[in-house]
Amino acid sequence: MLSKQRVVITSGEPAGIGPDLVVQLAQQDWPVELVVCADPELLRDRAAVLRLPLTLREYQPGTDAQPQQAGSLTVLPAHLAQPVNAGELCVDNSHYVLETLARACDGCLSGEFAALITGPVHKGAINDAGIPFSGHTEFFAERARCERVVMMLATEELRVALATTHLPLKDVAASITRTTLHEVITILYQDLQSKFGRAEPHIFVCGLNPHAGEGGHMGREEIDVIIPALDELRQQGMKLTGPLPADTLFQPKYLQHADAVLAMYHDQGLPVLKYQGFGRAVNITLGLPFIRTSVDHGTALELAGSGQADAGSFKTALNLAITMIKSSNE
């Protein structure tokens, strides 16, 4: 039952719009209990600035979950190193940001929480604090000891997963191997089944090169790597179409049949999805032993505390996590 489920939320960079969005989430009822890992004073201060009602209660492990009521939040406390001014980064709070991610992740791994929804973090501030950090996806993979996870962004109409994520373009081709494709496509296929309720997922796969290599005249990765990998996976019963040129694949005649698209690199697939659904897209990490969704935007420091931040993507991420919980329990 959803009413017996808890999800954990991290508000992200404290100087950004994450705390604003969490306060906005609290203004409506939810069918699950929302537990926010954050500094309680940060949430109180931001609610006061936004002039929105907010009652906080401290999270008590071992108690029964209660569906969320408008105007209230359950808080799993973490404490800032320095006071926060909305819109002003302070690298001293970077350890606080990572502490919230670690505690939320550990709670999901232990079964304490049914899903994790993350607000936007500021990668630059964390790295400026001397902490190597490339993103949520890699952080959770390392903490959960997963050798491979897959980044996927989704709207209501389109899901795009990535064979590679945060790599310089010059390193992409060398990272596309048969082993990589086997692992990525297997995770994508299995999570479409278990977390999205797709019994026989149909995955469309982009080529790496222009025109998918043009028969080897514009690169041989399709011939030497991608096609053999797809053929091997088809022999396992997977329904795969491709490799197709990306400028051909992202058309309605193909997308209407696709449960997901696999792009070879970050900027091959995500610009199309974000153009189609920015503000409504959700970032999902596949391959983790728990459900993780996230907003599709950044910290928007200039909007923090202004009341102008749009909680649409956060609400969509939370709603998708709830839907995935349902599918996982069926």
Curated annotation (Swiss-Prot):
Substrate binds at residues 136-137, 274, 283, 292. One of its GO terms (biological process) is pyridoxine biosynthetic process. One of its GO terms (molecular function) is zinc ion binding. Pathway: Cofactor biosynthesis; pyridoxine 5'-phosphate biosynthesis; pyridoxine 5'-phosphate from D-erythrose 4-phosphate: step 4/5. It catalyses: 4-(phosphooxy)-L-threonine + NAD(+) = 3-amino-2-oxopropyl phosphate + CO2 + NADH. It is found in: Cytoplasm. HAMAP family: PdxA (MF_00536). Catalyzes the NAD(P)-dependent oxidation of 4-(phosphooxy)-L-threonine (HTP) into 2-amino-3-oxo-4-(phosphooxy)butyric acid which spontaneously decarboxylates to form 3-amino-2-oxopropyl phosphate (AHAP). This is 4-hydroxythreonine-4-phosphate dehydrogenase. It comes from Erwinia tasmaniensis (strain DSM 17950 / CFBP 7177 / CIP 109463 / NCPPB 4357 / Et1/99). The lineage of its organism: Bacteria, Pseudomonadati, Pseudomonadota, Gammaproteobacteria, Enterobacterales.
